[in-house]
UniProtKB/Swiss-Prot annotation:
Alphabetized GO MF terms: ABC-type D-xylose transporter activity; ABC-type L-arabinose transporter activity; ATP binding; ATP hydrolysis activity
Domain of life where this protein originates: Archaea
Name the record gives this protein: Xylose/arabinose import ATP-binding protein XacK
Protein residues bound to ATP: G41, P42, S43, G44, C45, G46, K47, S48
CDD domains attached to this UniProt entry: ABC_MalK_N
Phylogenetic classification of the source organism: Archaea, Methanobacteriati, Methanobacteriota, Stenosarchaea group, Halobacteria
Localization of this protein: Cell membrane
Amino acid sequence: MARLTLDDVTKVYTDEGGGDIVAVEEISLDIDDGEFLVLVGPSGCGKSTTLRMMAGLETVTEGELRLEDRVLNGVSAQDRDIAMVFQSYALYPHKSVRGNMSFGLEESTGLPDDEIRQRVEETTDMLGISDLLDRKPGQLSGGQQQRVALGRAIVRDPEVFLMDEPLSNLDAKLRAEMRTELQRLQGELGVTTVYVTHDQTEAMTMGDRVAVLDDGELQQVGTPLDCYHRPNNLFVAGFIGEPSMNLFDGSLSGDTFRGDGFDYPLSGATRDQLGGASGLTLGIRPEDVTVGERRSGQRTFDAEVVVVEPQGNENAVHLRFVDGDEGTQFTATTTGQSRVEAGDRTTVSFPEDAIHLFDGETGDALKNRELPSNRAIDAFVSN
């Protein structure tokens, strides 16, 4: 069993003038045994610092870090039974694949040579690199080197894997292959895993749950679909998803949201969810924007196509409201067969069941999009 718990964990550094720099502030997380949790956020948000505190490479300023019932504060990195995989493969260039994978076991355990050899060979079989055992790192591709780095962690048979952007040095094709490989390995091994990334695709496709950080604070923890469809606040709404959610600042006048270039009438049911908020931000995902059709019951507006980005299977269409400021643009995704071009006049519709509304002052979500009343979806996004 390996349940990892962060209880109000804080990390504070001291600058040259003696002032405090709060890198991580009161983060609380319960990571279940065997769970794959992804820590995601922009550069400098505190995700790698959080991972390094878990590993024992950074001290915890305040709060408590536990592995099951064992408090890890003050426990050295080598005594935590936690293995870490870095962005840099950090392989010994003069050692073979076998030597790189066995070195840690030879130096820090009392395991007999036969058992070390067996562990290395079983792990290389699992990773599909058994034919590379006698090669040096300089003779390996980037993907092969990453597999060796993973294998070095796996042979330790740790309670927890920590991975700090391990795929960022690979090209796009290899990253896609390794995402699948990592998910397969983690499922087979059943080891609790915490994975740090800034990559949207990795966050959405790899984790059982996603923890979104910004400016050292935890913004939301949930399944990938939960964070995508039901963001807690403006930051999560704007950060999760590519292209990102369209966000329009405005105000409430009676039952109408008034934005730059468009007025959006709200139903009574939506209005009732807003409390006393008057300053609002309206959000809608690009895939929920309908282009070129006037649909009854949906709010439809005149727009002009600014730029079209063909992506093969779909297009990212950047538009602006005809009656709005030229600087206020938004995005719709359409099929790859869509025939719109820059300069075209068209219409866009924002279905009310697809919009999000956020408090203009706090950024907190007041209304998230409606989802189908499907038992499987509801169960998935509410865990």
